[in-house]
Every structure is written in structure tokens, then in C-alpha cells.
Amino acid sequence: MKALKIALTKGRLERDAVALLKKAGIDCSSMLDKKRKLIFHSNSQPVSFILVKAVDVMTYVKHGVADIGIVGKDVLMEASKSHYEMLDLEIGKCQFCLASTPDFDPSNYRRKIIATKYPTVASKFFREKGEDVEIIKIEGSVEIAPVLGLADAIIDIVETGSTLKENGLLIYEKMYPISARLIVNKASLKQNKTQIFQLIDQLEQAIKEERTK
């Protein structure tokens, strides 16, 4: 039986994903002693894991290097769809929010400058509102953009809001909820349908158990 290759997002989402996979009965023991390794093979099940950055999960899945990926909905919303989004894993929960300084006027967005790491998401949001804004893409810490006068407001993902508070920003609009999703390569789903749906069934059961805690 061919081993399923699963691409995981490095960092906190990786830890949450591994915990959920373990609960679903997937052998993740090879990842206990990671050191600098990025590829891991199970000794007891036909499964292997690849650790990559969030934005690269989709690339590995798209090109079939990974059969399955676990990545945040924020990454999926920003990129073109070239996969099947199969399951909301209900981990890594946060939210897209619009935030700015206390003197910001949210009643009129006309010609406002919005800084964000997610220009596609921001464009969609303001298009739905019928607002004409200028969107600036920033790769680093967007929180300082309104403080330094680069932008009138920001759009970013928010979990607790502590970083915004530390930089003197307030949340003015809560936009889209985010959580980690299971995505599958289109060709892999045809070739490994039984294996993949078995994994999905196991994960769904684990998610249900988490809900009842």
C-alpha cells in the first residue's frame, strides 16, 4: 500500500495537527525527535509527514508531492484553488479583523489606505462592501502601519488581540472566521480514495470527541 504523504504547517498549527492526528489513531511517533528533520516516516502505518511553511503546503499538494495538506483557511483564501478542501479540522481558530488606532472613523472607508498581508482577502471584503480603498501589501508586522501613518487601518488575523492592544490598536470589524483545513490533491483523491476517506473518517470522529469535552 502506498504511503500517504501529509504536508503539515510548521509551528503551533503543527502541534495542534499532530495532537489531532494522534487522537485519530495516526502514528506520529516518528516526529517526537525532530531535531532539524523535515520529513518523517511512520514505522507502523503507510503514512509520512512533511513539515513546510504554511504558504508552501498548497504548493506541495498542488504538485502532488504531498497527497494531503493541513493549512489555515487564511492561506487558502489568499491563493487560487487547485485542490479539494475536504474537512474543517476545528483547530488553529482565529479571525480576520480590521483594526486601527482609536481615532479611526469606520463609517467611511472611501479612499482609505489599508495595509495587510492578505490583499486578496482585503479586496474581497471591501468589494462586498462596495468601498473604494487602496490596499498595500506588507510582509512583516502590519500592526505598526497605522501607528506610523503608512495606512489608515490594517486587516490581519487575530487570535487573542493582545498584539493589537500592545500597539494601541482597536478592532473595528470582525470579518471571516478561520481554522485549519484538510486539503487533498485532486489526482491523489482518485488514486487513493479509500485511504484518504478512511483518514477523513478517523479525523471526523476525533473532532466529534473534542467537541464533547
UniProtKB/Swiss-Prot annotation:
Compartment(s) of residence: Cytoplasm
Assigned EC number: 2.4.2.17
Entries under Pfam families matching the protein: HisG (PF01634)
Pathway noted in the entry: Amino-acid biosynthesis; L-histidine biosynthesis; L-histidine from 5-phospho-alpha-D-ribose 1-diphosphate: step 1/9
One annotated GO biological process: L-histidine biosynthetic process
Keywords, alphabetical: Amino-acid biosynthesis, ATP-binding, Cytoplasm, Glycosyltransferase, Histidine biosynthesis, Nucleotide-binding, Transferase
PROSITE patterns associated with the record: ATP_P_PHORIBOSYLTR (PS01316)
Cysteines joined through disulfide linkages: none
Family designation: Belongs to the ATP phosphoribosyltransferase family. Short subfamily.
Function: Catalyzes the condensation of ATP and 5-phosphoribose 1-diphosphate to form N'-(5'-phosphoribosyl)-ATP (PR-ATP). Has a crucial role in the pathway because the rate of histidine biosynthesis seems to be controlled primarily by regulation of HisG enzymatic activity.
Subunit-level organization: Heteromultimer composed of HisG and HisZ subunits.
Principal subcellular localization: cytoplasm
Keyword Thylakoid tagged: no
GO molecular-function terms, A-Z: ATP binding; ATP phosphoribosyltransferase activity
Signal peptide coordinates: none
Catalytic activity, reaction form: 1-(5-phospho-beta-D-ribosyl)-ATP + diphosphate = 5-phospho-alpha-D-ribose 1-diphosphate + ATP
Keyword Transmembrane belongs to the record: no
Taxonomic source organism: Listeria welshimeri serovar 6b (strain ATCC 35897 / DSM 20650 / CCUG 15529 / CIP 8149 / NCTC 11857 / SLCC 5334 / V8)
GO CC annotations on file: cytoplasm
The protein's name: ATP phosphoribosyltransferase
UniProt comment concerning the protein's domains: Lacks the C-terminal regulatory region which is replaced by HisZ.
